[in-house]
Swiss-Prot record:
The chain crosses the membrane at residues 12-41, 78-100, 120-142, 162-184. It is found in: Cell membrane. This is Uncharacterized protein TP_0149. Keywords: Cell membrane, Membrane, Transmembrane, Transmembrane helix. It is a multi-pass membrane protein. GO terms for cellular component: plasma membrane.
Amino acid sequence: MSKYTVKRASVLCIFGIGLFVPATGTFACGLLLVLGFWVLFFSSLLARFLSQFFMRTRSAPLFEVCLTLSATIMYDNLIQGFFPLVRMMLCPYLFITALSRTLDLCLTAYDADAESLECVGVFGIMIAGISLVRELVAFGCVSLPAPSGFLRIISFPPSNVIRFAATGAGTLISCGIVLWIFRSAGNDHTPSLRSEW
């Protein structure tokens, strides 16, 4: 994989986090969202691996779409069975992710270099980190998914001064600051943002 592709994928990954800000208000939601994202990603890789050996090239994208959507539905049903209240918050975002992947497969030609495990790993870590920090700042606790809703494992009085940082607007602003720092730190090694695109 080229250095150009990895840098571009990393930047797009950071921008994409903004789409999931409403779903990362608690660590429990962020954790299940990251697991769903990985289920979607690896089901897509599995479909591509199987299609290389058992299917023709023209039918491979359709097989990948079907397996990806099936994996998303199975994961959604699994969450509904164990964590029904949390599932109500995450369901739209799980299927938005699956639909985005489906449109990507249907409307664009597949490029093997565009798939980056680094990007997927960074995306998952940042989603989990953002949800953890937001819940600590806003509610003064850390929660895990439970059948009755949320199980609090750490609790302390939240700070009213920095609570704004845990809201949707505050999180987007924080992501923008982190992205600016990320880009500024890389200026010594990369010519410019325009040159990477």
